Amino acid sequence: MSIKIKNFKKNIIINNNNFINENNCNNNNKNNIVQLCIMGDGGVGKTAVTTQFISNHFVYYYDPTIEDSYRKQICVSDKSYILDILDTAGQDELTAMRDQWIRSCEGFVLVYSITCKSSFNQVLNFREQIIRVLDRDDVPIMMIGNKSDLVNERQVTYHEGKELAQRLGMSFMEVSAKNRSNIDEVFHEAVCCVKRKEELYRIKSKHVKILKKNKNPLKKKINEICKVM
């Protein structure tokens, strides 16, 4: 049986009233675009989570995605950001496209369904692919367990999700796209993850420059001594 996959490019900019406060939010942030990639197995609700965040709307039907792009403005820690969200395919036959998606983004949200153990197990594979493509293991990644409203169909416990996330250094939440539980919080935390990593990288780079600067005079002095000898 073949699956007809539609690809609609959605470039939407929406103000999120839950996070934006015109009096407190700084709209002059120069680095205000945060590129997020939503990844996970097919059918876990990646599009449902994204659509609920973007337009407060729950998608009841399953229409497999190739690549959908969304934009939304939010305020995090009194700073305004535009989220550039890439909703990606989970189908195995489209795995070749993932490398390109990964390279285009700076933060990642890995989605599994609490009602499907195999989708939870696949999180490791998605994370490994991200690390392989970007060639670094400090990528801002968070993991979310969707469909938390389906308590009677649960196959993955909250503890299992939290333990895996902690072991791999990822932020973690359980969410429900259907009743909008923790949806805004996911994207708020995703921005924080990206910005924390950026700040750590900035501090690390600054320390490296200081160390190099301090080493140069010593190296010069040693060379002078060697010449004299």
Curated annotation (Swiss-Prot):
It holds the Pfam family Ras. A motif (Effector region) lies at residues 62-70. GO terms for cellular component: plasma membrane. Belongs to the small GTPase superfamily. Ras family. A lipid is attached at residue 226 (S-geranylgeranyl cysteine). This is Ras-like protein rasV. Ras proteins bind GDP/GTP and possess intrinsic GTPase activity. The modification Cysteine methyl ester is found at residue 226. The keyword ATP-binding does not apply. NCBIfam families: small_GTP. Residues 227-229 form a propeptide.
